[in-house]
Design a protein with these regions (language model features):
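Catalytic core of pol beta-like nucleotidyltransferases
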Residues: 1-86, 90-101, 111-287
Length: 287
């Protein structure tokens, strides 16, 4: 974590100084001259980081490119399920990195009021997959098409949103980003990667199942699945305090987020630790 050398254009996407790209590049070079940054092979990184991370990054980038056809294939498969409205790529692959520890993570926008039916069908399908294929089918985040604004507005969420790669149906992705313009206060110069996006029409079976459940029975079933999922997770993770449970297993009518081991908190805490360490070792205040 935080050992990923960056190209100047990637750093520029995260800057909030309101300066031109040329001026920003010159600022980076000045920091290198003052030994506040290191530079090698066109990558910038902390002066306290290992140069070997460049080799690791390059290999991960090659792996990511090779994995994209697989991600698109599984994204299409997810979209075939009832009540899925759009599918985007998240996780490390959305950031152009993939290694032996990586999964393929998906961010799914669902029809309003049917998120939990949608998720349950996808989880049942996931359980039927081989161990190898399960790592290509990680649906960790579901959100209702009518409630798209993220509740948590922090650097972690901003990064995840701004690096989403829309795979199936760009309209759903565009609507998501329209409801989360706050992301620009963290990452304001990054354009989404749209080169993998395709528009797919729902199939006959998908339409039929959706029509069959577009009634009070569907409402009751969705509410039932929400209730049972929360009960199951509370039994499985009784050690979690209410606040931690809410953060790791956000389960509401219009959203489902499942991130075990407190990953978001760990990332944000490590970011602050590294920031403080850099300030101490260089004498430069970052905030």
């Amino acid at each position: 974590m935080f050992e990923y050398p960056l190209r100047p254009e990637e750093l520029y996407a995260h800057q909030g100084l309101g300066i031109s790209e040329d001026a920003f590049h010159q600022m980076l070079e000045d920091m290198v001259d003052k030994k506040l940054l290191s530079k090698k092979e066109g990558f910038y990184f902390s002066p306290f980081a290992r140069h070997e991370n460049i080799v690791r990054r390059k290999k991960g980038n090659v792996n990511a490119l090779e994995m994209m056809p697989t991600a698109i294939k599984w994204g299409k498969r997810i979209f075939r399920f009832p009540f899925v409205r759009s599918v985007s790529l998240s996780g490390s692959l959305s950031k152009n990195y993939f290694d032996e520890h990586s999964d393929i993570d998906f961010f799914v926008v669902t029809k309003s009021g049917r998120l939990w039916i949608c998720r349950t069908l996808l989880i049942l399908y996931w359980k039927s997959l081989s161990l190898k294929n399960k790592k290509y089918f990680c649906t960790n985040y579901f959100i209702d098409e009518t409630v798209l604004e993220m509740e948590e507005k922090n650097h972690f969420t901003a990064t995840e949103l701004s690096y989403l790669v829309p795979l199936i149906n760009a309209a759903g992705f565009n609507n998501l980003m329209t409801h989360n313009t706050w992301v620009k206060s963290y990452i304001n110069n990054r354009a989404p990667v749209l080169s993998y996006t395709i528009n797919v029409q729902p199939g006959i079976v998908k339409k039929a199942i959706e029509a069959l459940l577009q009634n009070p029975i569907g409402d009751m079933l969705d509410n039932f699945l929400l209730k049972k999922t929360i009960e199951r997770w509370r039994r499985k993770y009784p050690e979690l305090a209410a606040e931690d449970f809410e953060l790791q297993f956000r389960s509401r009518k219009n959203v489902c987020k499942r991130h075990t081991k407190g990953f978001q908190n760990k990332v944000l805490q490590q970011l602050e630790t590294l920031r403080a360490d850099y300030e101490t070792r260089t004498g430069v205040k970052l905030s």
